[in-house]
Amino acid sequence: MGRLTEAAAAGSGSRAAGWAGSPPTLLPLSPTSPRCAATMASSDEDGTNGGASEAGEDREAPGERRRLGVLATAWLTFYDIAMTAGWLVLAIAMVRFYMEKGTHRGLYKSIQKTLKFFQTFALLEIVHCLIGIVPTSVIVTGVQVSSRIFMVWLITHSIKPIQNEESVVLFLVAWTVTEITRYSFYTFSLLDHLPYFIKWARYNFFIILYPVGVAGELLTIYAALPHVKKTGMFSIRLPNKYNVSFDYYYFLLITMASYIPLFPQLYFHMLRQRRKVLHGEVIVEKDD
C-alpha cells in the first residue's frame, strides 16, 4: 500500500541541507552541506557539500524548542548568529579582494584563516547532535561536516599549488552564500521571526549553489591529483612495521567516484523537500 506523507510549508518551523554541498552539506557533498546534512526541511542545502544533505528533523519546531530549554535555545541562537556573521565577514573579504586585485589569484591565501576557523568551528554541529539539542543524525552530520573539513584542511590547505585554481573560487562562493542563508534561516527561526525572503532563499538558492559547489570540489580534487601522485603525500607504503598500506591518490579517485551516485540522489531529494515546504505539495511514497 502507499503511504501518504504530507509536508506543508512550516514557516519558521522548517529546516533544510556533501559533500559541499553541503550542500547539504552537499554532501554536501559541499554546498551543498547540517543541522546535519539531511533533508532541506531539516538540514543543509549545501551541498552544499556544494552543500547538500539528506533527511533529518526540524530543529525549530515550537514543541521541540520548548523541550530544548532556555539555555540550549540561547546557545543555538548565539551559535547561529556567530556563524552567520563569520560567513558574512568571509563574503565581504572575498568581494573586497576581487575589487582591489581584479583577479582570483591569491584570494584563498587572503581568506584562509577566516575560512579555516569558521569551517572547523562547525564541528560543534556534531556535538549538538550528540548531546541531543539538535534532533538529527550524528552520522549524517558527521559525514557532511567532515567532508567540508576534508576539503579545507586535506586538499586546499595541504596542496598549495591548487590554491589559485578557479575551481576553489567556485566552491568558496557556493559555500559562503549557502552558509549565510542557512545560518540566518536558523537564527530567524529560533527567534520566531522568519522573513519570507530568507525562507525562499533557503529553498531556492541550492538549485544553483549545490551543482556549483560540487563542481568546484570535484575540479579542485582533480587538480590535486598530479601533485598527490608525484609526492606520495599522506600515503603509507609497504613494508612497514604495521603491515598497512594506504594510497592517498587512489583514495581521492574513490572520493570523486562517490559523487556519481550521491549527487543525483541528494539533489532530487532536496527538490522534493522544496516542493513540500514552498508549495505544500502532498508526496505519495510507495511501501516496498
UniProtKB/Swiss-Prot annotation:
Residues annotated as the enzyme's active site: Y210, E217
GO annotation, biological process: cementum mineralization; fatty acid elongation; long-chain fatty-acyl-CoA biosynthetic process; positive regulation of cell-substrate adhesion; protein-containing complex assembly; sphingolipid biosynthetic process; very long-chain fatty acid biosynthetic process
Catalytic activity: a very-long-chain (3R)-3-hydroxyacyl-CoA = a very-long-chain (2E)-enoyl-CoA + H2O; (3R)-hydroxyhexadecanoyl-CoA = (2E)-hexadecenoyl-CoA + H2O; (3R)-hydroxyoctadecanoyl-CoA = (2E)-octadecenoyl-CoA + H2O; (3R)-hydroxyeicosanoyl-CoA = (2E)-eicosenoyl-CoA + H2O
Pathway(s) of this molecule: Lipid metabolism; fatty acid biosynthesis
Annotated GO MF terms: 3-hydroxyacyl-CoA dehydratase activity; enzyme binding; hydroxyapatite binding; very-long-chain (3R)-3-hydroxyacyl-CoA dehydratase activity
Membrane side Lumenal: residue ranges: 96-114, 160-165, 222-251
Modified how: N-glycosylated.
InterPro entries with a match to the protein in the record: Tyr_Pase-like_PTPLA
Low complexity bias locations: 7-34
Positions of the UniProt region annotated as Disordered: 1-63
Transmembrane stretches, start-end: 76-95, 115-131, 142-159, 166-180, 204-221, 252-269
Tissues and organs where the protein is expressed, per its UniProt entry: Isoform 1 is highly expressed in the myocardium, and to a lesser extent in skeletal and smooth muscular tissues including those from stomach, jejunum, and bladder. Also detected in gingival fibroblasts, periodontal ligament cells, osteoblasts and cementoblasts. Isoform 2 is specifically expressed by cementoblasts but also detected in periodontal ligament cells, heart, liver and kidney (at protein level).
Stretches of the chain found on the membrane's Cytoplasmic side: 1-75, 132-141, 181-203, 270-288
Glycan attachment sites: N243
Keywords: Developmental protein, Disease variant, Endoplasmic reticulum, Fatty acid biosynthesis, Fatty acid metabolism, Glycoprotein, Lipid biosynthesis, Lipid metabolism, Lyase, Membrane, Phosphoprotein, Transmembrane, Transmembrane helix
Modified residues (Phosphoserine): S22
E.C. number: 4.2.1.134
Gene Ontology cellular-component terms listed: endoplasmic reticulum; endoplasmic reticulum membrane; membrane
Similarity comment: family membership: Belongs to the very long-chain fatty acids dehydratase HACD family.
Disease: Congenital myopathy 11: An autosomal recessive skeletal muscle disorder characterized clinically by severe hypotonia apparent at birth, motor delay, and walking difficulties. The course of the disease is non-progressive, and affected individuals achieve independent ambulation and tend to show improvement of muscle weakness throughout childhood and early adulthood.
Subunit structure: Interacts with TECR.
UniProt-recorded name of the protein: Very-long-chain (3R)-3-hydroxyacyl-CoA dehydratase 1
Species name: Homo sapiens
Lineage: Eukaryota, Metazoa, Chordata, Craniata, Vertebrata
